[in-house]
């Protein structure tokens, strides 16, 4: 049996239980460099726990998913946060779930507009990178160091994401 999921717009308020939305928020803007640069300050905080841990910056290249897509697993990082910021102006999906006793609950799906990134908080259940429509590259900031920083969970039943380009979602 499978369960249909709805796709929600990505907003700071809706995503707050899972981490931070990374976008050019006018409330956080300040001018620097003699007024030549707009700095959008402190949009998210990086978390890297454990002795010998550090923060690394990566580029991930995500292949587009085929929709409808069945979510059958989720992952989380118990020792650090993980952020994804797109390098191209392409929509992408963010799939998260609240923790229910060391297992993910029902997934929630957000569509990011291509100018929005996210920072998953430590221990937040999420699906791996979900590009839509084309190969997409992302700057990924996460933790490196000793210790197991990956837990996976496989659902007994699938949760289905409809095609995000379908007319019903516009």
From Swiss-Prot:
Its EC number is 4.3.2.3. It catalyses: (S)-ureidoglycolate = urea + glyoxylate. It is an enzyme of class 4 (lyase). Its cofactor is Ni(2+). InterPro entries: RmlC_Cupin_sf, UAH_cupin, Ureidogly_lyase, Ureidogly_lyase_bac, Ureidoglycolate_lyase_dom_sf. CDD domains: cupin_UAH. GO terms for molecular function: ureidoglycolate hydrolase activity; ureidoglycolate lyase activity. GO terms for biological process: allantoin catabolic process; purine nucleobase catabolic process. The keyword tRNA-binding does not apply. The keyword Lyase applies. Pathway: Nitrogen metabolism; (S)-allantoin degradation. Keywords: Lyase, Plasmid, Purine metabolism. Belongs to the ureidoglycolate lyase family. Catalyzes the catabolism of the allantoin degradation intermediate (S)-ureidoglycolate, generating urea and glyoxylate. Involved in the utilization of allantoin as nitrogen source. Homodimer. This is Ureidoglycolate lyase 1. It comes from Rhizobium meliloti (strain 1021) (Ensifer meliloti).
